[in-house]
Every structure is written in structure tokens, then in C-alpha cells.
């Protein structure tokens, strides 16, 4: 039997449908072979955490809260909601009025976005449990139909909840800052520039994102130690 020669496209590493700790480690090794800068991050800090979140309404609420604020303040607001609701469900969320949500730490806009999300789920307009069977583009499009769910929120949900190996939140500030450092750029890249920079990392951009997040977090710790 004659073996078909590899095409140029075959040189890219293959990606699993869903990342696991084992496939994440394999992905780090694969990216290290094609990008010496990412290899340096892996040598310095090892394989990054999976940073997995459960699929569903609570994770999407938390991700909405994380839009353009510190992760610590978003988590604090979410924990206040969870303490009051016991279980964060669409039904429970809709029992809180705007004043109560503001007391938890929700801005007026984010309270509206989460309320619209809860209603979409209860009205049958959105079934988050079905997203795992969708392709990346379809899952992204389904999420972005919702008011308040933009590209960053959808990509982070794909990356952390659905564990898609090529999810890539190019608008993420921490990714941009880490990429500037790792790639020794003169300025923080824009989302479009980061997309272009990440092209060689397909179809494992979510693995690269975890490496860059790890670089960002470890870099901050080293700065504090100084």
C-alpha cells in the first residue's frame, strides 16, 4: 500500500474535541515544538492548570460578571449571589430585584444581561446543555445571540466550560499583556494583532491561552516578590 504524503496542512498538531489534563499536557508539548517562546513559558512554569468550569447558567453569569473588571471583584459579587440563592439557577436569579443585585455587586447592565439570560433559558430560547454537541462556530453564535454576550464572553465559555482546544479570547487583557512580554513586543497587541500572532497555534490556541495566562499570573507574582 502506498502511503499518502503529508500535505502542508497536516503539519499542524491534531486537537481533541475537548481538552483534558492529559491532552492539555500533550498540547503544551506540541506547541513547544513550533514556538520557542511558548516553550520557554512551559520550561519556566510547567503545564498550566486546566482552569475548568462547569457548563451551565452559573458559569455564564460569572463570566458576564468578569467583563472588564478584576476577577476578584467579579468572584466576590458571584459569591454574594450564591450565598443568597443557595443554588444559582435561572429561577432563583429572577427572584432578586435590581437593588438586591446591586448590593451583591452587579452593575445595572450586568444585572440586565443576566436577567435576559435567565429568561432565555426558562423560555426555551437557549439550551446551554446542547452547546457541547455544537461546533465552535455554532456554539459561539448561539451564545452571542444574547444581549450582553460578546466575543470575549463566548470564547471564555468555550475555553473554560466546553474546554474547546481552539477557543481564543483575543480581546482578553491578560492574554494581550502576556503576549507582549513573551513575544517581546513594543506595545500591547490589539485583538486583531493577537489573532494574527496566534495563527500558528491553531488548532490549539486554548492551550496557548492557558500558557499565556500562566505567564501573566507568574509574572505578577514575581513582580510582587521584587
PLM regions and their residue ranges:
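Alpha-helical scaffolds flanking conserved acidic
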Residues: 25, 55-59, 139-140
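C-terminal accessory module of base-excision DNA glycosylases/AP lyases that mediates lesion recognition
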Residues: 1-48, 132, 136-137, 151-226
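Buried hydrophobic packing segments
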Residues: 61, 114-117, 179
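Non-catalytic interaction surface on structured domains
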Residues: 42, 52, 56, 103, ...
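Hydrophobic (often cysteine-bearing) scaffold residues that line and stabilize catalytic clefts
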Residues: 57, 61, 70, 74, ...
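Alpha-helical ds-nucleic-acid-binding substructure associated with the helix-hairpin-helix region
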Residues: 18, 37, 41, 69-147, ...
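Structural motif
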Residues: 50-58, 105-109, 198-206
Amino acid at each position: 500500500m502506498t502511503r499518502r504524503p503529508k500535505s502542508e496542512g497536516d503539519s499542524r498538531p491534531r486537537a481533541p474535541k475537548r481538552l483534558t489534563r492529559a491532552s492539555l499536557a500533550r498540547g503544551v508539548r506540541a506547541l513547544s515544538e513550533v514556538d520557542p517562546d511558548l516553550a520557554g513559558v512551559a520550561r519556566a512554569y510547567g503545564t498550566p492548570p486546566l482552569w475548568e468550569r462547569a457548563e451551565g447558567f452559573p458559569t455564564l453569569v460569572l463570566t458576564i460578571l468578569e467583563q472588564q473588571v478584576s476577577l476578584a471583584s467579579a468572584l466576590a459579587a458571584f459569591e454574594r449571589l450564591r450565598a443568597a440563592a443557595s443554588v444559582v439557577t435561572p429561577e432563583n436569579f429572577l427572584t432578586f430585584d435590581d437593588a438586591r443585585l446591586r448590593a451583591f455587586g452587579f452593575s445595572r447592565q450586568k444585572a440586565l444581561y443576566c436577567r435576559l439570560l435567565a429568561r432565555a433559558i426558562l423560555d426555551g430560547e437557549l439550551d446551554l446543555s446542547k452547546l457541547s454537541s455544537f461546533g465552535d462556530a455554532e456554539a459561539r453564535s448561539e451564545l452571542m445571540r444574547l444581549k450582553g454576550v460578546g466575543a470575549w464572553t463566548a470564547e471564555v465559555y468555550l475555553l473554560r466550560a466546553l474546554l474547546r482546544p481552539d477557543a481564543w479570547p483575543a480581546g482578553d487583557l491578560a492574554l494581550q499583556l502576556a503576549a507582549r512580554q513573551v513575544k517581546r513586543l513594543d506595545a500591547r497587541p490589539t485583538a486583531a494583532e493577537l489573532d494574527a500572532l496566534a495563527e500558528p497555534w491553531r488548532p490549539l490556541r486554548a492551550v496557548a491561552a492557558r500558557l499565556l495566562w500562566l505567564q501573566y499570573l507568574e509574572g505578577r507574582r514575581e513582580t510582587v516578590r521584587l
